[in-house]
């Protein structure tokens, strides 16, 4: 009987200690009124509805206006893994006729922050081959007005057009190559046996590291740009008599 009595007393004490505290036990000054949470939830819902209903063009324009206020540490460009010969930050436009063999140049006498070091190829060659033509015609230009791009995850992201580096506004340029014409000749690609092959020229892509918008901060992302023009072949069906 005594053992049962002690067991009941112990169970009662444990239940008393485990009982949830009432609001009267909460220290003064730490209670948050329910009206505050209701107002906060209403504000979040309103902001979410506005973000979903805002046109993409308006968002891009707002982001473009904020890029001048984004300051980037120049030491960030010293990391080799972030360098790309097809991405350039410069205060002046690159030359219109860019050389695809040497994308490393100096603008206005000052080297860009993300300049890479590659050996220059000689413009002269001891052997000249006459009558050589590319199967596809391509055009290469520096693009400085890119506002959106597709990242490596297939998501559309905002590209930073301009950034502030050492109190100077640098513009982000991308060296892109694309096909001039999908059919340089009537049969498709140049120099292809049209009797046995179907052919056409198409632009291919690659991913480069670029500065993009991540909320209100700049972030490095892999984005897709046009980088080459290649010939696509498919064998024609053989007609049997």
From Swiss-Prot:
PROSITE patterns: NGF_1 (PS00248), NGF_2 (PS50270)
Positions of the pro-segment in this chain: 19-121
Signal sequence, start to end: 1-18
Molecular-function GO terms, alphabetical: growth factor activity; lipid binding; metalloendopeptidase inhibitor activity; nerve growth factor receptor binding
InterPro entries for this protein: Cystine-knot_cytokine, Nerve_growth_factor-like, Nerve_growth_factor-rel, Nerve_growth_factor_bsu, Nerve_growth_factor_bsu_mml, Nerve_growth_factor_CS
Intracellular or extracellular location(s): Secreted; Endosome lumen
Function recorded in the entry: Nerve growth factor is important for the development and maintenance of the sympathetic and sensory nervous systems. Extracellular ligand for the NTRK1 and NGFR receptors, activates cellular signaling cascades to regulate neuronal proliferation, differentiation and survival. The immature NGF precursor (proNGF) functions as a ligand for the heterodimeric receptor formed by SORCS2 and NGFR, and activates cellular signaling cascades that lead to inactivation of RAC1 and/or RAC2, reorganization of the actin cytoskeleton and neuronal growth cone collapse.
The protein's name in its UniProt record: Beta-nerve growth factor
Native source species: Pan troglodytes (Chimpanzee)
